[in-house]
Amino acid sequence: MTTAVLPRVGIGVDVHPFAAGRPCWVACLEWPGETGLAGHSDGDVAAHATCDALLTASCLGDLGKVFGTDRPEYAGASGAVLLAETARLLAVGGWVIGNVSVQVIGNRPRMAARREQAQAAMSAALGASVSLSATTTDGLGLTGRGEGLAAIATALVVRA
């Protein structure tokens, strides 16, 4: 009897409030002129949701377990660093990343003009295909009120 290798899917969510005086990093890009996001690392919600989706898909934990506030070496770390480390952990665990789809939710920054650049930056950091979309909540909730930014990611992984 043969056993089929089935893909696994993970979902990740990340939310950060805006924080004046910090640079704004979203999808591994700096967004000059935009208010930054509070967080232990750079607050990159797109990168963080992506890491969380990959870690849960591969049963390697979640964002808080792997990069939590109890890990001083990740204080101020960029989303690109977290993506690269997540990819390394998956490879060591015997997983291959199929792809990731991430959606940024909020009024600002406006992602459309830099979508391809953001996808390329995230894909390069991760070493796998990342697609990016963005939406607003039409004035509803914390993102609609302009209090912060959120992201939801879905990741597909398979055994190496």
Curated annotation (Swiss-Prot):
Pathway listed: Isoprenoid biosynthesis; isopentenyl diphosphate biosynthesis via DXP pathway; isopentenyl diphosphate from 1-deoxy-D-xylulose 5-phosphate: step 4/6
NCBIfam families, sorted: ispF
Species for this entry: Frankia alni (strain DSM 45986 / CECT 9034 / ACN14a)
Cofactor(s), by name: a divalent metal cation
Key words of the record: Isoprene biosynthesis, Lyase, Metal-binding
Reactions catalysed: 4-CDP-2-C-methyl-D-erythritol 2-phosphate = 2-C-methyl-D-erythritol 2,4-cyclic diphosphate + CMP
Protein name: 2-C-methyl-D-erythritol 2,4-cyclodiphosphate synthase
Family to which the UniProt record says this protein belongs: Belongs to the IspF family.
Catalytic activity, EC: 4.6.1.12
Keyword check for Signal: no
Reported function: Involved in the biosynthesis of isopentenyl diphosphate (IPP) and dimethylallyl diphosphate (DMAPP), two major building blocks of isoprenoid compounds. Catalyzes the conversion of 4-diphosphocytidyl-2-C-methyl-D-erythritol 2-phosphate (CDP-ME2P) to 2-C-methyl-D-erythritol 2,4-cyclodiphosphate (ME-CPP) with a corresponding release of cytidine 5-monophosphate (CMP).
Record text on cofactor binding: Binds 1 divalent metal cation per subunit.
Assembly and oligomerization: Homotrimer.
Keyword Metal-binding carried by entry: yes
GO molecular function: 2-C-methyl-D-erythritol 2,4-cyclodiphosphate synthase activity; metal ion binding
Residues reported to bind 4-CDP-2-C-methyl-D-erythritol 2-phosphate: D14, V15, H16, H40, S41, D62, L63, G64, T135, T136, T137, D138, R145
Encoding gene per record: ispF
InterPro entries: MECDP_synthase, MECDP_synthase_sf
Binding site for a divalent metal cation: D14, H16, H48
One of the Pfam families matching this protein, by short name: YgbB
Site (Transition state stabilizer): H40, T136
Gene Ontology BP, a term: isopentenyl diphosphate biosynthetic process, methylerythritol 4-phosphate pathway
